[in-house]
Curated annotation (Swiss-Prot):
Source organism: Azorhizobium caulinodans (strain ATCC 43989 / DSM 5975 / JCM 20966 / LMG 6465 / NBRC 14845 / NCIMB 13405 / ORS 571)
Assembly and oligomerization: Homodimer. Part of the ribosomal stalk of the 50S ribosomal subunit. Forms a multimeric L10(L12)X complex, where L10 forms an elongated spine to which 2 to 4 L12 dimers bind in a sequential fashion. Binds GTP-bound translation factors.
Gene that encodes it: rplL
GO molecular function: mRNA binding; structural constituent of ribosome
GO biological process terms, semicolon-separated: translation
Record's keyword terms, sorted: Ribonucleoprotein, Ribosomal protein
Record InterPro entries: Ribosomal_bL12, Ribosomal_bL12_C, Ribosomal_bL12_C/ClpS-like, Ribosomal_bL12_oligo, Ribosomal_bL12_oligo_N_sf
UniProt function note: Forms part of the ribosomal stalk which helps the ribosome interact with GTP-bound translation factors. Is thus essential for accurate translation.
Record's GO cellular component terms: cytosolic large ribosomal subunit
Family per similarity comment: Belongs to the bacterial ribosomal protein bL12 family.
Pfam assignment, any one: Ribosomal_L12
Name of this chain's protein: Large ribosomal subunit protein bL12
Domain of life: Bacteria
Cross-referenced Gene3D superfamilies: 3.30.1390.10, Single helix bin
Amino acid sequence: MADLTKLVDELSSLTVLEAAELAKLLEEKWGVSAAAAVAVAAAPAAGGAAAAVEEQTEFTVVLANAGDKKIEVIKEVRAITGLGLKEAKDLVEGAPKPVKEGVAKDEAEKLKAQLEKAGAKVELK
């Protein structure tokens, strides 16, 4: 039990950026997505079949490849996400990675166009 208390204390002392990075690392390690878990938990049990027929309303903008203009893509990723230079560079170099999750279709298409204009290959999921 003392180990769990120590772990809770350490997690409580993380900054927001450190907590976000921890979430990304855990998603990669366990092969899950925090956004998907929230969507599944929020879906009603009886309306599962009806929800599958409805059009997708939330999208994840995924950077598939940075292309040849990596610096331009890093600048766009920073502008879109508000990440620092190192975090944006790590995201671009670690492609394929999600840039933004849970966005509306029109915003997702706008972000895709921005990133593609900078030279990136982008997917919407």
